[in-house]
Design a protein with these regions (language model features):
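Short, non-transmembrane alpha-helical segments in secretory-pathway proteins
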Residues: 92, 96-121, 238-253, 296-338, ...
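Secondary-structure-rich domain cores
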Residues: 257-283, 292, 297-353
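Sec-dependent signal peptide hydrophobic core
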Residues: 10-18
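Preferential activation on post-signal-peptide N-terminal prodomains/segments
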Residues: 17-304, 427-428
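Conserved histidines in hydrophobic membrane contexts and catalytic metal-binding motifs
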Residues: 309, 344, 364-366, 405, ...
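Aromatic/basic-lined ligand-recognition segments
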Residues: 332-369, 401-404, 410-412
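Short helix-loop boundary/capping segments
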Residues: 357-392
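N-terminal Lys/Arg-rich, disordered targeting/topogenic segments
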Residues: 1-7
């Protein structure tokens, strides 16, 4: 490399550093309207924009597979046309990767939220923007943590929402959501950092429509409908732990070696160790409980508890649940426990439908207390699309008949065959 080229490269590097420095200082000085976001949020935002980590290396694949991915996403163009996805997990993954940054930017830069009304919320859903719908309400502070924000904007911390959207209105961006606890609607102006139009313009509207756009009197007006999707498959279910190799791997993950051997009670293997006891049923259900008293060395936040539980799910159920195009394990909800700690619930979602796994509907529940897992129940299943067709009422008619909020569901009663149905939400035992 000659001296002139070397000088030019140094100049280019200096220019890049100066630009980054200016952007960083602007961020820190609230130049972009980020009223409460910190430098960590800037780095998370930079990673989301560049697709890499702070050190410049590519972001790991796990980054796009957060426990709180939505079960429905809609892009709305300037004319009010929607491109919606609900039933294809691969399409949901792709859209999530390309649209999560709008919510990262909104949650980190929002002005204090202001109460608004249903009419404004409906207008927002028909405006240029991006819409996320979750299987259960998610605390916005937790959603921010999944997106890489250390602290969401002031006023958003305590809110929880199933449905939220970020819109572009006259060159200004706004976050809208419905608070789950009160049912009230809120909006907050946010910074304009990424062009929503660039993303929505890459897709042509499909049949997606919100229920209120077809029927103003709908009992579930904000349900996203896909009228052109008229067929939903039946599913086949199997117990992956019937494989000796899979069983051995799962046992090792859970801290169980082959010796000493378990004893058996009513077709259930019982493993007793110094610091835990574990039951493995012949239907693939694992019940694990810590036996020693957990040291109280720190308080676990809700976000930390969910992350810890999600890591366990990734190492266990997610490895055996089936093809990633068909099924995934989704975060469902959190219960704060008396005496401290959190119980985290997860659910299988297959072919775009929530699996109701008997007896209580969940794929797993994991309790985290004092910085460690103290108890868990894991229900191992492998789901695949059945070759037999399923008969189901079309979605639009189901919306009219539901009398409330609903989504596609599958009832796993242990028979091995799951037919689709339209249950009302919330999905609880």
């Amino acid at each position: 490399m000659n001296r002139r080229k070397l000088i030019e490269l140094v100049k280019d590097a200096v220019i890049v550093l100066l630009v980054l420095s200016a952007v960083f200082l602007g961020w820190e000085s609230r130049l972009f309207g980020n009223t409460s976001a910190d430098a960590g949020s800037f780095m998370a935002l930079w990673q989301s924009i560049t697709g890499g980590t702070a050190g410049g290396s590519p972001a790991p694949a796990q980054q796009a597979a957060q426990p709180g991915k939505p079960v429905a996403i809609a892009l709305t163009d300037g004319a009010g046309g929607h491109y919606g996805v609900k039933y294809s997990l691969s399409e949901l993954d792709n859209l999530y990767v390309n649209t999560a940054r709008y919510f990262l930017e909104a949650l980190s830069s929002a002005q204090p939220p202001q109460e608004t009304d249903a009419q404004a919320w409906r207008a927002a859903l028909k405006s240029l923007g991006v819409y996320f719908e979750y299987i259960s309400p998610v605390r916005l502070s937790v959603l921010g943590d999944w997106l890489g924000i250390s602290n969401v904007a002031a006023g958003l911390e305590g809110a929880a929402a199933r449905r939220l959207c970020v819109i572009d209105s006259g060159g200004k961006n706004y976050l809208y959501f419905q608070d789950d606890a009160t049912g009230k609607f809120y909006m907050a102006q946010t910074a304009v950092l990424s062009s929503i139009a660039d993303q929505t313009g890459a897709f042509s509207p499909n049949s997606a429509v919100f229920a209120f756009e077809k029927n103003e009197d709908s009992a579930a007006p904000y349900t996203l409908l896909l009228p052109d999707v008229t067929e939903h498959p039946a599913l086949d279910a199997a117990n992956p732990l019937s494989s000796a190799a899979a069983k051995t791997k799962v046992l090792l993950t859970l801290g169980v070696s082959e010796l000493p051997k378990p004893y058996t009670v009513d077709d259930t293997e019982v493993y007793v160790r110094n610091n835990f006891i574990m039951y493995l049923s012949n239907d693939g259900t694992v019940s694990w409980t810590a036996q020693d008293e957990a040291p109280v060395y720190r308080v676990t936040t809700e976000s930390e508890a969910i992350d810890m539980a999600a890591d366990m799910i990734a190492d266990t159920l997610a490895d055996y649940c089936g093809s990633s195009d068909t099924v995934a394990v989704y975060y469902d909800s959190t219960q704060e426990q008396a005496g401290g700690g959190y119980r985290i619930f997860f659910r299988y979602v297959a072919a775009g439908g929530a699996v109701y796994l008997r007896p209580d509907g969940y794929a797993a529940s994991i309790t985290v207390k004092n910085g460690r897992i103290s108890e868990m129940e894991l229900r191992f299943r492998t789901y695949s699309v059945s070759t037999e067709p399923a008969v189901l009422l079309p979605e639009v008619q189901a919306a009219a008949a539901a009398g409330g909020d609903f989504m596609l569901g599958y009832d796993d009663d242990g028979s091995g065959r799951l037919a689709p149905f339209w249950p009302k939400l919330p999905l609880r035992s």
